[in-house]
Amino acid sequence: MDPFADTLQRLREAFVSGRTRPAEFRDAQLKGLSRFLRENKQLLQEALAQDLHKSAFEAEVSEISISQNEINLALRNLRTWMKDEKVSKNLATQLDSAFIRKEPFGLVLILSPWNYPLNLSLGPLVGALAAGNCVVLKPSEISKNTEKVLAEVLPRYLDQSCFAVVLGGPQETGRLLEHKFDYIFFTGNPQVGKIVMTAAAKHLTPVTLELGGKNPCYVDDNCDPQTVANRVAFFRCFNAGQTCVAPDYVLCSPEMQAQLVPALQSAITRFYGDDPQSSPNLGRIISQKHFQRLRGLLSCGRVVIGGQSDECDLYIAPTVLVDVQETDPVMQEEIFGPILPIVNVRSLGQAIDFINRREKPLALYAFSNSSQVVKRVLAQTSSGGFCGNDGFMHLTLASLPFGGVGSSGMGNYHGKFSFDTFSHHRACLLRRPGLEKIYAIRYPPHTPRNLRVLLMAMETRSCSCTLL
């Protein structure tokens, strides 16, 4: 028996009825999301603490407030985003109405991960609801406490004829993906991303894949080591390093490494104390499986900071590795933990070559007092996002699209980009039924004169002026 058939049929029928299309309905759903966050803030903080040992600060900054900001932005701009977008016209269409209409795709599937289980569920959900879709949300079963809140509490705040939360592990997700959806939004690792894309291809379903990768962090000799260390340590250890845009490794000269290591030690001690395990500000690894994987990476290179672990507490200390080789296991996969390898390069050119030999990352960071150095890294590399002289602060701007490139993903979202991602941009031209004598120039028998006139009339114009 198919456990999802009835739910999907209910949602698809609701979409076909046109229920989700009016701005008033979309507005009500977004306000429901907002109430969910306000009225269940403590419950959500407790769930995030149980799943990931997230501090109240991290939960507020990276899960609750950022989701609320997305909702507020959508509520303020919904009707503007929904408006038909007028486009420029050529001479042949000057008497016509030409525009782009933003239409919902229909039935959308959102597959969210465990590392930011609230933010990475609600972020795409805001865009999908604002665009007028019906939505199936499949949260990660690994962050089980947050999953429980999303499954049991969130639906009370939304129209359940148009929204559903489904549960399960990999086997259930596989069965879910056998169904035809009109759009699939997946956040996770590239291996599972390939499975999702393969399933989507069977139905020619469009996808957004928010994946990961090894995010390089180049540190130039011309910079203040302590400032760099503060920012790199903070972003590397935020959420215990379980962030898809965290700096994954540092590229710097041996001379800068000699200054950076003690600066990193100083920053880690100031942030988390002499015993980071007792700090309320340092999270824990999500599961035994991920803990064992990370502990295995501690044997790479040479540990100069940290290296401690506690299996019972799922604790990995903030760790810095040096003497790391490009072929070491820690350089073959996204780390997703509070471990920072340092790889030595002799020049900026060598660092850029190192980056470009690898898969395109989700984020790339460059630190230097020289704007020319930062701009050169930006110009000569490719990544989903880029930030000069800081960590993943570019994510805080809803005016910037968030997404990967190549193996780090495809498509993007945040702010209006979320609305556009979940909207079909329909090309529309409305023509008057008369004026047949003018339009008859297109018809056979063709003459050189008619061809010249027609080509001139169809020529693309840069001017957007219209007669109507």
Curated annotation (Swiss-Prot):
Membrane-related topology note: Lipid-anchor
Lipoprotein recorded as keyword: yes
Pathway listed: Alcohol metabolism; ethanol degradation; acetate from ethanol: step 2/2
Active site: E210, C244
Record keywords, A-Z: Acetylation, Cell membrane, Lipid metabolism, Lipoprotein, Membrane, Methylation, NAD, Oxidoreductase, Palmitate, Prenylation
Modification sites for N-acetylmethionine: M1
The reaction(s) this protein catalyses: an aldehyde + NAD(+) + H2O = a carboxylate + NADH + 2 H(+); a long-chain fatty aldehyde + NAD(+) + H2O = a long-chain fatty acid + NADH + 2 H(+); a medium-chain fatty aldehyde + NAD(+) + H2O = a medium-chain fatty acid + NADH + 2 H(+); octanal + NAD(+) + H2O = octanoate + NADH + 2 H(+)
EC numbers, comma separated: 1.2.1.28, 1.2.1.5, 1.2.1.7, 1.2.1.48
Gene Ontology molecular-function annotations: 3-chloroallyl aldehyde dehydrogenase activity; aldehyde dehydrogenase (NAD+) activity; benzaldehyde dehydrogenase (NAD+) activity; benzaldehyde dehydrogenase (NADP+) activity; long-chain fatty aldehyde dehydrogenase (NAD+) activity; medium-chain fatty aldehyde dehydrogenase (NAD+) activity
Lipid tethering residues (S-palmitoyl cysteine): C463
Record's keyword annotation contains Acetylation: yes
Post-translational modifications: Dually lipidated in the C-terminus; prenylation occurs prior to, and is a prerequisite for palmitoylation. It is also required for activity towards long-chain substrates.
Protein name listed in UniProt: Aldehyde dehydrogenase family 3 member B1
Organism: Bos taurus (Bovine)
Classification of source organism: Eukaryota, Metazoa, Chordata, Craniata, Vertebrata
